[in-house]
Amino acid sequence: MRKSPASLPSEAFSSSNSSLSNSYSDGSDLANWEEYVSTDGSLFYMEYVRCEKTGVSAERRVEFMRRSLRLGKKSSRRQPHSNNQNQSQNQNQSHGPSRLDSQTEPQEFRFSQFKTAAPDPKKLDLVITAADRFRFGRRSTAVESILGFRVLPFPDQPECLMVDGFVHDVSALQHGIKRGDWFRSLNGIEVYASNVDELLKQFVEPTQVCLGFQSCGAASAVSPTDPGYNRNVREEQVCKVENFPMFTEKFEQMLITEGNFGIPGSSVDIRMPFAMLLLPPECYQHEQQQDSLYYFPEIPDNFLFKARGSFLTLHAVLSELHTQPLSSRLLVDQVQYHVNYRQLNGFLVLFAYAGGLCCAAECSLRSDELIGYIRFSLPGLVLESFNQEREPGNSSRLKLFLRHFCEIQRTRLVARCHGHIRFEELLGQSRSLPLPKEAQLRIFDALSEMEAMDYRNWNDEPLTTHREFFIYGSALYYDGFLVASLLPPEVRVSVEGFLRCRGIFELLGAAPGIKVREMYVWEEIVLPSATGRYFLTICTKNHLSLAVILKIFDAPDMAPDAVVGPSLFYIEEIQETLDHLVQCGIESLAMFWSVSNKRPEVLDATASESRDQEKEPNNRLESFLKQKLTVLSPSVEEEAQLCSSLGGSSIHSLTPSEDESCRRRLTPIHGTAEDSDSGSDWENFAVQHPLHYGLNLGAESHSQSQMTESMWKEINNVVPVKISAGWKNSVLHYVYIDIANGSLFAPFTDSSENSNYLSEIRQACHIIHAVLQKSKHYRRHLSESSRAQTNSNGHSSHTVSLVKEHGMILEVSTQPKSDGQSQSSTSSRFVVVGRLFQSPAKEVYVCHRSDVPQNIVEMAFRLSFFSMG
């Protein structure tokens, strides 16, 4: 916020309060990222931990154990980090015993230890008032705002609260209060998780209160040698990335070495997997342009640099024929390369990809993505920009940007390709993750409240205060999937290109050895056909990323080229929104939904192959069942699929008119005869869904789920739904592209067993996509010419029929497993169909089995409901 000169003292007070978070892990007045802001105002800061390849459930269970129950409120303070690991031991001792205990060895505090430990009561006198309820944010808890410390429920006694950390240096640190102490009483009244908020809100006027604590000493904490110690909770070494050049240096190590990507003999053996050349077409007409402006790799053996004259000649010859070159295929040192030509502000840009890593269609889509990112990041790139770089004493910031950009693309290509064909990841649309309606409403409420920015609850001078920035729009992502967006589609495409080409999406979703705890990105951008200065802000917490575009308030006293650094207040507001979404269970729901394979269900290729082998013995039985269909009652699975509603976008698969017996059949059986609304049914939900609660079901439950009961009950009744016709599901893959909204809906996970099948399916999708794109281009050309030239009767003279639907039949052979037995290779036949729709504009690609004919129009109609959530 920006204030008038008369309100500067209150501004210092307001900013100091609003910026308190775990970013102040070293006890200073600066956030953990503030000292890494560059001279031009940009910021790239990340904290991550290296985690071993344990099960997903183990990692998620530890995460749930560390969370607190905020009753739907958003915490404005995140968990403290161990940022002082590189400091000396004397410095660690000077910060108090609480920080020293948290850095020596991991401890798990239990309420049962207080029964055996000697009582060590502590008291703390404070003057509190309920007027401080919102001084740390809109949804900060009452304990944080009024008392100044955070509390957590004990794992074995959720009703009792323990001290988890301190918001700032309150007097509690001077009285020996430390992490793990039992927050026992307030003015002699026992404090529990259910009554702490009501007790604190009663003090309307400033009142002196006495807080009672009981210490949890070294004997009270569970040590690693105790049998009750949870070994999954281990000390995590936090690593920092202070700027983007440092991120570029570590990106290959994080994504390939620690992510265990790369296949020996394929992508690693290629000496030059990616190359780039940027040069002006008139480089031989002027002496100062004899050499190319930039080429990567910056080595003399770069074949693009050595053959730049041939590329310029080809470009000049085709330009005289009123056409442009698109791609070339070269053979360099027995390695095939695909070279794509692109135009950028009068420059000729060449991208070369090794043919063993990706096909020609993939290279074309990748080149479109890269040139879009360069156009978005360098909108004013002209020849003079490079001439300024040659001046002595001037920093080569532009060439450093291009070098880092190319290094990231080379690592992305090596890590993500290695022979596996990609299709939906390379399209310009956003890969959406449609969550249930209740979750979508909560997300949009949180984003709308963040954009509203109502300061009246904690702003002392609202009349003399105005916003420093205006929020242009925001978008929420889970890994690389779009969860919700309040951005225009064309702007969102540019933002996602920024996230992909910077390697952020690959790091979040494709590096299992890396867990990103926090990330902050601040960079000035230029929006097309928009006035003013805009800044892209990206905040990441675990798997959730929130991208926000801010527009600065045009102050009269601000210079047009003034350096604008990151806004501490706005970054904290964005991070608070992320904390609120994580606490509401959005991250857990997105993780569950991305691997559920229910809406709609797709077949596993290996299961489909085994079904082919069993098909012949079961032909007679199936024919008998078809004849007796009117006599025999349908099975539970068939009846569940028939009762599933495809006529609406709600995630509920039941309608009010359905009877209770059908509802019981659709509800998973939990060992009791009660329905899904009973308490025992909800308690046994963890057994049926170990992905959310962890596979260690024998251990005692340490914390409640952050997902609300209504949201989990909403997805509890969800059954797998098929979009194909026939008795059984026959769909293996689908891609639903909504061109109007700029979104894409496809299966979320790729199994390693299905990689060969998916590569063939995506290759067929590339071929069909090229046919449909040519049809769309010719349709536009035909409509323009038909409007100019029409017959007297009003009909066009062109009678060429355009392609709306195109299909292919694939036969994939599988090699027998090397188990010592002689087995013959089997083959499976699939049908890949793509169709182009006009109103609304969309493309649909479906791969299904060839034994049952399908109607792609009907399948596209069913997919349209699931794409909305």
Curated annotation (Swiss-Prot):
It is found in: Cytoplasm; Cell membrane. One of its GO terms (biological process) is establishment of imaginal disc-derived wing hair orientation. Disulfide bonds: none annotated. Residues 1-28, 70-106 are annotated as: Disordered. Keywords: Cell membrane, Cilium biogenesis/degradation, Cytoplasm, Developmental protein, Membrane. It comes from the Eukaryota. One of its GO terms (cellular component) is cilium. Disruption phenotype: Abnormal wing hair polarity and in many wing cells forming two or more hairs instead of the normal single hair. SUPFAM superfamilies: PDZ domain-like. Its main location: cytoplasm. Residues 81-97 have a biased composition (Low complexity). Residues 70-80 have a biased composition (Basic residues). Plays a role in the definition of cell polarity via the planar cell polarity (PCP) cascade. Acts downstream of fuz and accumulates asymmetrically in wing cells to regulate planar polarity in the wing. Probably acts by regulating ciliogenesis. Interacts with mwh. Belongs to the inturned family. PANTHER family: PROTEIN INTURNED. This is Protein inturned. The gene is in.
